[in-house]
């Protein structure tokens, strides 16, 4: 057997894959091998690690110097049928039938990536097969192009409009200030280079893309000699190469005429660095501004509180010293540059980072929310502050804080939006795509040790970095993005002109033919026989027993000699521990509940023990990885097992409560210092810094305003659910539209009064008692547990007092327009923008019942079939989904970036009626069960495993009930699913609350509802 990790085999080939390099990756306790296929040029990088969650990713360099969105449209389109899998949507069929822990497609400015992950090997290879066929051998027919990209449609009144999934998705992207400001900044810094264009597509330019250009793009960029296949996990390299060789290599050789003198030739097989075709290498060239200048752009005013003003410097290639410099200058609010910008009151929020997504980075320092006329003040402040920091030096505390922050980040294992291997994939591709060795960015801990050595050796090291990157560069770019109230009007006018131009050249006969073909294609419902080509795992092959994280309950003696509940979650945290100290807020009068989110935010931001907030932040950053305020609310499910579970702990008063408190994370070697500081914070919290509270208030308002559009789906859900029960009403008060009204009411002149209120709330919460939760590994626990009794006394933790259950009558005064939540008319959340969101809520069965499991299966099938076909594929929305929250006894349907959100609700309700008379085939039910099972076995990070297990205990829903849900799931039959469909339809006739987030144009002629004001 070929040994891929034997250096003696470098230069030798296995099935024509030449082993080029072996990389030791001690930072990740792994090693990697780099190979190139000597006939096709396909390259492979496999990070070999003892991890059963294997990941593959087909990646292609896909650069374009237009904003027509061809890379993005291609990303969608290759997943719409291929040679071996000639379905409408193999991707969604695969996603709805596999055990994947991650399955996606991602368009970056310089590449397109198709990753998939699974903990089941057979399932992993199934996904690799379907994805490989999709990227190398897609159908790419004209119907797919006009469905996913752009087309002209005509409504019932004869009015023309432009439609398309990507087109509508990107209209949503052009609906708020911040993403447009960032995009314009990047365009300015790299003029006439690929980053200056929108790889996702600008809706005003997407219709310029022709079908032939689309086909040519695939031919050019999706060839095997431009494919970078990233692999991660414990499946042996030879098995993966055997699979690629068997399924694809021969077909690729034939398709691309891979022979001497053929379409692919002149490959430098022995090159230790990636081979990049010359035309692609030319596209990778970045252009830079050659002299300092001032630039101004306009962006939509939606989400803005003023202009974005920044000073920018080119910084060269990415490396760890730039990350260190960012952390020193702006790693936390007390860092010197961040502090100066905040204290200036010239803007709402600090912007400082190195833009590292390209081969060359640039630093950006400035402010959001700058009032007109203050731009020059911001530029001068940034330069003046950097000069002062250089002249005066950086304090040791700021350096220690930065070192702690980076050390912690490099040690912590997180799942942000997928497996940890996705982060390794991105690090690898950053070098690989640009012609650097694949391991260039895979030694961050080792690299940072060199930075720490420089810090130890040279006291002026940080000063020299400031001089190198900020004071010496001859090119400085002053950038301003102003909010424009005319932005949407101007784009709408441009879109109207575009449609008029299209109409002038429109061949209406051909248009009708194209649309007829498209609609026939979209309306075709694939049979089980057709979808059977997608490989699946059978229910009989599934492990019935699943991994369940555990949390144990112990007690320690509190300051009042009572037993304080101590929850312990033992997980593999890599020498890090997480501690929650929580206090109930459910003994407060209801009028204070609306202020809980801001109260939690400020807990660690106003200082303690007589020290200023900045001093406290700097000190805590040297000891802890982080500390922040948190809230937690919920209810005990109305299920006999959950009620019985909660009854077991009734004497301790911790089940079914609402909590506020602190969570901190720290390295175990700093445990004693960290716990002492946490006790000091809890007992010596200050509420007297009026000036800083005003700053935090301004930042909160800006944050809420900036995020309104992007959180539209969340706001519709919470709004539509608010009238159903007390817990959901509280969610609306704290996190929904009602919270926006609360934040709008915060005024600077009330800061003193608010501090007094927060002080009262804090004291009342502390008097209500407390609980502690620890997540750490076994070695850390041995060190921590002896410290906890002393900590509980120092922190003055006391026995939990009984809580109060708020009634709807108590809560309703704090829900804006509460009467609108009580009927089934649509609640219209009106905002400016170019797209929308919808939510519809109907009743479901109770938690842990077999009926609930069947409803979960039906909802998943509905999402992946009917809603996908009718709302996403035909309707043009970017997404539509349905799921069951049986804890709250609700079925939730939502749409995302939806051009017709009101119509989507109508389609959903009509579909329920139609499906009652159209049974779902047994094979489809079984596939959906397998997919739902896959959701149950997705791995979690150590921190998240501990948190979920702990939170489950607080609400009578321990993680072991997850096994009950899996057992019920595996027993679901097609008859159960039919009955679930009937229940959905019957429930919808009785009660369906609805909310739509969009501009006024979303309303249809027949839609009636309540208009709900969106403030800020």
Which residue ranges define each predicted feature?
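C-terminal regions of mature proteins
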Residues: 2-8, 233, 402-570, 715-819, ...
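N-terminal cofactor/phosphate-binding cores enriched in small/glycine residues
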Residues: 33-120
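Non-catalytic accessory/assembly modules
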Residues: 81, 139, 143-174, 178-179, ...
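A structural supersecondary motif
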Residues: 99-102, 310-314, 329-369, 621-636, ...
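His/Glu-based metal-binding/catalytic segments typifying zinc-dependent metallopeptidases
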Residues: 48-52, 57-59, 167, 171-172, ...
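Catalytic or ion-translocation cores adjacent to nucleophile or general acid/base/metal-coordination motifs
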Residues: 83-86, 96-100, 255-283, 578-580, ...
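Acidic/histidine-enriched segments that form metal/cofactor-coordinating
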Residues: 2-5, 81-83, 90-217, 323, ...
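Non-catalytic terminal extensions that flank enzyme cores
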Residues: 2-55
């Amino acid at each position: 057997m070929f040994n891929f990790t034997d250096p003696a085999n470098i230069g030798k080939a296995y099935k024509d894959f030449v082993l080029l390099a072996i990389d030791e990756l001690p930072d990740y306790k792994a090693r990697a091998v780099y190979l190139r296929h000597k006939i096709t040029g396909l390259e492979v990088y496999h990070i070999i690690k003892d991890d059963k969650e294997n990941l593959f990713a087909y990646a292609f360099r896909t650069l374009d110097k237009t904003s027509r969105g061809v890379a993005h449209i291609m990303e969608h389109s290759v997943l719409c049928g291929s040679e071996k899998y000639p379905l409408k949507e193999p991707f969604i069929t695969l996603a709805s039938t596999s055990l994947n822990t991650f399955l996606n497609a991602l368009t970056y400015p310089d590449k397109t990536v198709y990753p998939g992950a699974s903990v089941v090997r057979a399932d992993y290879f199934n996904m690799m097969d379907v994805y490989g066929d999709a990227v190398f051998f897609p159908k790419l027919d004209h119907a797919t192009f006009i469905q996913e990209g752009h087309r002209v449609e005509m409504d019932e009144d004869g009015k023309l409009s432009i439609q398309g999934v990507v087109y509508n998705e990107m209209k949503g992207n052009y609906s708020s200030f911040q993403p447009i400001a960032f995009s314009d900044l990047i365009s300015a810094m790299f003029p006439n280079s690929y980053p200056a264009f929108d790889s996702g597509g600008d809706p005003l330019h997407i219709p310029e893309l022709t079908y032939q250009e689309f086909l040519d793009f695939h031919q050019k960029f999706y060839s095997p000699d431009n494919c970078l296949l990233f692999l991660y996990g414990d499946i042996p390299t030879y098995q993966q190469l055997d699979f690629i060789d068997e399924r694809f290599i021969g077909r690729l050789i034939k398709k691309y005429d891979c022979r001497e003198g053929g379409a692919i030739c002149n490959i430098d097989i022995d090159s230790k660095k990636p081979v990049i075709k010359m035309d692609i290498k030319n596209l990778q060239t970045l252009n830079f501004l050659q002299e300092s200048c001032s630039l101004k752009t306009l962006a939509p005013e939606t989400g803005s509180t003023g202009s974005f003003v920044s000073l920018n410097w080119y910084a060269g290639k990415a490396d760890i010293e730039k990350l260190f410099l960012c952390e020193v200058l702006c790693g936390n609010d007390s860092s010197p540059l961040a502090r100066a910008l905040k204290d200036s009151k010239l803007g709402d929020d600090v912007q400082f980072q190195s833009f590292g997504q390209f081969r060359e980075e640039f630093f950006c320092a400035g402010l959001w929310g700058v009032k007109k006329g203050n731009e020059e003040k911001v530029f001068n402040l940034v330069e003046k502050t950097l000069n002062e920091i250089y002249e005066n030096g950086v304090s040791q505390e700021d350096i220690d804080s930065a070192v702690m922050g980076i050390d912690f980040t490099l040690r912590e294992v997180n799942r942000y939006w997928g497996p940890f291997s996705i982060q390794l994939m991105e690090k690898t591709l950053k070098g690989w795509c640009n012609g650097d060795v694949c391991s260039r960015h895979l030694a961050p801990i080792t690299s940072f040790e060199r930075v720490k050595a420089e810090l130890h050796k040279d006291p002026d090291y940080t000063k020299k970095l400031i001089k190198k990157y900020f004071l010496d560069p001859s090119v400085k770019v002053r950038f301003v993005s102003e909010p424009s109230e005319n932005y949407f009007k101007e784009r709408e006018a441009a879109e109207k002109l575009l449609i008029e131009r299209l109409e002038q050249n429109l061949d209406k006969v051909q248009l009708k033919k194209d649309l007829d073909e498209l609609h026939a294609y979209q309306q075709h419902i694939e049979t089980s026989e057709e979808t059977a080509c997608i490989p699946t795992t059978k229910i009989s092959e599934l492990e019935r027993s699943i991994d369940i994280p555990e949390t144990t309950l112990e007690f320690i003696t509190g300051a009042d000699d009572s037993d304080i509940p101590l929850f312990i979650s033992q997980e593999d945290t890599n020498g890090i521990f997480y501690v929650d100290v929580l206090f109930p807020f459910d003994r407060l009068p209801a009028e204070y509940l609306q202020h809980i989110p801001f109260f939690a935010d400020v807990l660690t931001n106003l200082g303690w023990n007589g020290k200023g907030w900045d001093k406290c932040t700097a000190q805590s950053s040297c000891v802890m990885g982080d500390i922040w305020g948190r809230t937690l609310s919920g209810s005990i499910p109305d299920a006999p097992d959950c009620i019985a579970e909660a009854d077991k702990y009734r004497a301790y008063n911790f089940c079914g409560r609402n909590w506020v408190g602190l969570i901190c994370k720290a390295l175990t070697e700093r445990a004693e210092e960290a716990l002492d500081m946490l006790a000091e914070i809890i007992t010596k919290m200050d509420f007297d810094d009026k000036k800083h509270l005003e700053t935090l208030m301004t930042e909160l308002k800006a944050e809420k305003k900036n995020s309104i559009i992007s959180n539209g789906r969340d706001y519709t859900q919470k709004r539509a659910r608010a009238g159903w029960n007390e817990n959901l009403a509280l969610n609306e008060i704290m996190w929904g539209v009602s919270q926006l009204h609360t934040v709008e009411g915060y005024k600077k002149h009330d800061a003193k009064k608010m501090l007094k209120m927060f002080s009262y709330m804090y004291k009342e919460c502390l008097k209500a008692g407390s609980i502690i939760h620890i997540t750490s590994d076994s070695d850390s626990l041995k060190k921590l547990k002896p410290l906890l009794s002393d900590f509980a006394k120092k922190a003055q933790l006391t026995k939990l007092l009984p809580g109060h259950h708020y009634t709807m009558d108590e809560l309703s005064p704090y829900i804006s327009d509460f009467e609108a939540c009580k009927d089934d008319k649509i609640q219209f959340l009106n905002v400016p923008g170019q797209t929308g969101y919808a939510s519809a809520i109907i009743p479901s069965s109770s938690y842990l019942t077999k009926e609930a499991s069947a409803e979960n299966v039906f909802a998943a099938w509905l999402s992946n079939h009917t809603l996908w076909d009718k709302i996403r594929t035909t309707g043009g929305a970017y997404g539509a989904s349905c799921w069951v929250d049986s804890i709250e006894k609700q079925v939730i349907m939502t749409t995302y970036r939806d051009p017709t959100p009101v119509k989507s609700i109508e389609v959903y309700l009509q579909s329920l009626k139609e499906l009652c008379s159209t049974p779902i085939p047994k094979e489809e039910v079984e596939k959906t069960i397998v997919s739902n099972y896959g959701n149950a076995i997705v791995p979690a990070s150590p921190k998240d495993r501990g948190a979920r297990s702990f939170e489950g205990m607080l609400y009578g829903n321990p993680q072991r009930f997850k096994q009950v849900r899996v057992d019920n799931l595996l027993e679901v039959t097609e008859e159960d699913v039919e009955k679930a469909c009937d229940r959905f339809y019957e429930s919808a006739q009785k009660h369906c609350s609805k909310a739509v987030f969009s501009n006024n144009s979303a309303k249809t002629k027949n839609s009636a509802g309540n208009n709900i004001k969106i403030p800020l």
